[in-house]
Amino acid sequence: MHLFWGGPDLAVTRFSGRPAPPHPGGIPNLPDWVAREAYSHEVSSCGFWPGGGPISHAAFYSYAYPEPAGFSEAAIQPGGAFYSTDLREFILPYDVVRQSESPDDTLLAFLRTTYEAAADLAHWDRSALERHRDSSGAFLPNR
């Protein structure tokens, strides 16, 4: 978990372990050399944006770099989440989460489905990257 530079968003990033093509840069308030280093490996990233700038309202977001083919068309949950072609990421307005019957489940569905779309479409070795727990909460060995 980290505070993303250039903006006050709180983010979590997962890495595939594979190198990514050089990032083209051009991110506002972020030197190109920093973008190239930050995105030197394939990522699926999600976070919370309090609003302002390109998104006027508070929202959760999720993106992948490099963006795999088909990512923008992936079936993402919950209803209310959408893909922004301007930002090249999925957006879930905070109000959708806040007003849902189960905010935790609503947010988890967004985070889970966007990660799964990124990892599956990019052919990540999920069995080597993910840890699972048994009913007692103990971690199971990787498959």
What are these regions (language model features)?
Residues M1-P50:
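Aromatic/basic-lined ligand-recognition segments
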Residues P22-G26, A74-I76, W124, A128, ...:
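General "foldedness" signal
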Residues H41-P93:
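Low-complexity, glycine/alanine/valine/leucine- and proline-rich hydrophobic stretches
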Residues I27-N29, Y63, Q77-G79, A109, ...:
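General N-terminal targeting signals
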Residues F82-R143:
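TerminUS-proximal long segments
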Residues R18-A20, P54-S56, G70, R98-S100:
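Residues in flexible loops and secondary-structure boundaries
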